[in-house]
Amino acid sequence: YDAVNEKGLGMAGLNFVGNAVYQEIQEGRENVAQFEFIPWILSQCASVEEAKKMLAEMNLVGTVFAPQFPAAQLHWILADQYACITIECVREGLKVYDNPAGVLTNNPPFEQQMFLLNQYMHLSPKQPENHFSEQLPLQTYSRGMGALGLPGDLSSTSRFAKVTFTRAHAVSGDSEAESVSQFFHILGSVDQQRGCCEVAEGKYEITIYTSCWNAQKGIYYYNTYENHQITAVDMHRENL
């Protein structure tokens, strides 16, 4: 569930099962069905700031696309090149959060994801110093020990923490090729491999595809589970 418009505003929906609560239709409000939320925003807004104003007047409802397609329980990340927000429709109503991490995964709610980052505030890309005991001559025995304790499992909270850390410390060159390459390395740190996350007998959750967008040039980059080669599509050259 991801899309981007010609102005460089991008939006993605991620699973929020058990927490998403859509509202009933209200007179006098801009009632928007969950399945049309992304195109409703991207067809009218050029920036996060414009979207915030529209969200204040919107009522997100659970109208289904068709009887066989119930409303997907999602929360959303919305970003341009200057700002990023998270949008959640919960029992208390529509919540809009500034997202300084620039990251979103599935459940739990965004505020809880951000709070859990407090557990990792001691982590660093630098080698650690011995604060355990002045009486013990402790030394590092491997590179990367400053990030010892960074989650590596495939749960959404662990993936949120790991990709937030990776994004915060990843270093890229100035060229577009270097930036795109580094982006795919960042998301690759939380790839899901077939067989490691079983959701039913013989069925596994995998990273089907990974994508990013050059907001200034309108170029969409992606690769897939079966093909790691990065493909570039210049949307301004396509018949849309």
What residues fall within each predicted segment?
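Short, surface-exposed beta-strand-loop junctions and turns on beta-sheet-rich folds
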Residues: 17-19, 92-95, 102, 226-230
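Aromatic- and glycine-enriched pocket-lining scaffold segments that form the walls
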Residues: 48, 52-89
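C-terminus-biased signal that marks the final domain/tail of proteins
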Residues: 64, 71-72, 81-83, 104-240
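A contiguous strand-loop segment
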Residues: 1-29, 57-58, 62
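Short hydrophobic/aromatic-rich beta-strand segments that constitute the beta-sheet cores
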Residues: 11-13, 96, 220-223
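Proteins synthesized as precursors that undergo proteolytic processing into mature forms
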Residues: 28-64, 176-185
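Structural recognition of the beta-strand scaffold that forms the well-ordered cores
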Residues: 10-13, 77-79, 86, 212
